[in-house]
Design a protein with these regions (language model features):
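Glycine-rich loop(s) and the adjacent beta-strand/alpha-helix scaffold that form part
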Residues: 27-30, 34-36, 41-51, 216, ...
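Beta1/beta-strand and adjacent pyrophosphate-binding region of the FAD-binding site
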Residues: 4-20
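Accessory recognition modules or surfaces
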Residues: 4-9, 45-56
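Short, solvent-exposed loop/turn and secondary-structure capping segments
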Residues: 46-50, 91-93, 101-102, 180-182, ...
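Redox-cofactor-proximal catalytic regions of oxidoreductases
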Residues: 56-146, 307, 311-314
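Residue-level detector of alpha-helix initiation sites
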Residues: 18-19, 23, 265
């Protein structure tokens, strides 16, 4: 792994090592661009990952927060503080947003209390990028990659779907290896995918993008490095960041470009905390919308008591899909 000087202002600093930051860092490093990735959390190895609830204490962002608004700043937010970010705890379900979902306002109209709007882009605009992402991540059911075999949850789902006359049901599109690929093993259906994946079959930047970037010699990962502030010069051009290391010591890393990829809470917090005389409302906030309009990802769940033993904890979190 490369090591860059704190005063090297030719590097690109990326804040965060998850789906956005980890992937960006690898793409830049592969093209010969020098990258310093600052990650607030620590780096885990496969030996640190266990199949159990205790993993959430290892990977979750548990730091207490202070806020000035009416809402509780410590509201439950399933984000991670670890190398790999939320690619460590996601279930691996890699589904495309469907064409009709890009036109929510057109399709559903104005709804009381809702702020529905149409996307400024369409499904066709993203199609080629979806294709590239699915290939990079090894998404099952795409690029000739076989789907995962059905676990017991899926067998129950499929039997019910068949009895009801459905024809289109399968184990979904998952960024979890159904066969050896990209130097990682096939899924063994051991469950607890959202605890990090103990064998590395699930796509996570911890297992994929970060080590590939390090292998180029153009990438330095600094875990347990909490960015406090983004600095800029008198013209307003970003010049670097100030961060605290694992011991609380403060450092300034110079940079030619800073990419902020610290999830939906930490990114706006950092931008707002980087306010200055030149940018009194925080960085990148000419709209006044940074830190506003927070939207959570909703998930519906259904549980049922079955006549036979199912062992729902085994296998992937998403049993399957019925269309």
């Amino acid at each position: 792994m490369a090591q860059f000087d704190l005063n090297d202002d030719s590097v690109v600093v990326i804040i965060g090592s998850g789906a956005g930051g980890g992937t960006l860092g690898n793409e830049l490093a592969q093209k010969g661009i020098k990258v310093v990735c600052l990650e607030a959390g620590r780096r885990l190895g496969l030996g640190d990952i266990t199949n159990g609830g205790e993993m959430f204490a290892k990977i979750s962002w548990l730091d207490p927060r202070e806020g000035s608004g009416d809402l509780d700043p410590n509201l439950p937010a399933w984000i991670c503080k670890t190398v790999g970010g939320t690619t460590m705890h996601w279930a691996g379900a890699a589904l495309r947003i469907q064409p009709h979902e890009f036109k929510a306002l057109t399709n559903y109209g104005r709804l009381p209390g809702a702020n529905l709007d149409d996307w400024p882009i369409t499904y066709n605009d993203l199609d080629a990028y979806y294709d590239r992402a699915e290939d990079k991540m090894g998404v099952t059911g795409t690029h000739g990659i076989p789907r995962l075999p059905g676990n017991n949850n899926y067998k129950v789902l499929a039997a019910g779907a068949k009895n009801l006359g459905y024809k289109d049901y399968h184990t979904g599109n998952m960024a979890i290896n159904s066969r050896e690929r990209d130097g990682r093993p096939a899924c063994r259906q051991i469950g607890f995918c959202m605890s990090g994946c103990a064998i590395g079959a699930k796509w996570s930047t911890l297992y994929t993008e970060v080590p590939k970037a390090e292998a180029t010699g153009n990438y330095e990962l600094r875990p347990e490095s909490m960015v406090i502030r983004i600095n800029h010069d008198a013209r307003g051009k970003v010049t670097g960041v100030v961060y605290a290391d694992a011991n609380g010591a403060m450092h300034e890393q110079k940079a030619r470009i800073v990419a902020v990829a610290g999830n939906s809470i930490e990114s706006p917090r950092l931008l707002l905390n980087s306010a200055s005389n030149l940018f009194s409302d925080g960085l990148a906030n000419s709209s006044g919308q940074v830190g506003r309009n927070y939207m959570s990802h909703l998930t519906g769940a259904v549980y049922a008591v079955m006549p036979g033993e199912v062992n729902l904890h085994r296998g992937t979190q998403m049993a399957g899909i019925i269309k």
